[in-house]
Amino acid sequence: MQCGLVGKIIKRFEQKGFRLVAMKFLPASEEHLKQHYIDLKDRPFFPGLVKYMNSGPVVAMVWEGLNVVKTGRVMLGETNPADSKPGTIRGDFCIQVGRNIIHGSDSVKSAEKEISLRFKPEELVDYKSCAHDWVYE
C-alpha cells in the first residue's frame, strides 16, 4: 500500500480479464497476520514477516475468473523478486523477498480460507462485467 502501486496492480488483473468482486483497505493486525500465515509460523522469517506486514495498511482484494489462482500466481512472479521475470508484479516492483508487496493464494482451497478471514459472503459482489463476452467464450 505504501508504494502507491494499488492502481497498477488492479489494472494488470483487469486487463487480463479478471473481475474484482471485493476490496478493502484496512490495517493488518498481528492477530490476523498470524492466522493468515499460520502455515509459516515455524519458519525463521515469520516474526519479520508479521512485523513488516503489520507496519501499515493493506488492500485486500478478491478476484474471479477462469483459472484466476493459477494465472494470478504467474502474474505475481516468484516469491523471491530476484527470481521473478520482468513483466511480473514482483519482477517489476519488488527487490527483496522480505519486502514483498503482494500476496496471492497458492490454491483454490487457500483462497477460500483467506477470503473468509477478511470478507463476509455478502461482501462479495456478483455482477457481469461489460468485458465478459469479449474475454470468455
From Swiss-Prot:
The gene is NME2P1. Its EC number is 2.7.4.6. This is Putative nucleoside diphosphate kinase. Its cofactor is Mg(2+). Signal peptide: none annotated. Major role in the synthesis of nucleoside triphosphates other than ATP. The ATP gamma phosphate is transferred to the NDP beta phosphate via a ping-pong mechanism, using a phosphorylated active-site intermediate. One of its GO terms (molecular function) is ATP binding. SMART domains: NDK (SM00562). Belongs to the NDK family. ATP binds at residues 45, 73, 79, 90, 100. It comes from Homo sapiens (Human). NCBIfam families: PRK00668.1. One of its GO terms (cellular component) is extracellular exosome. GO terms for biological process: CTP biosynthetic process; GTP biosynthetic process; regulation of apoptotic process; UTP biosynthetic process. The keyword RNA-binding does not apply. The keyword Cell membrane does not apply.
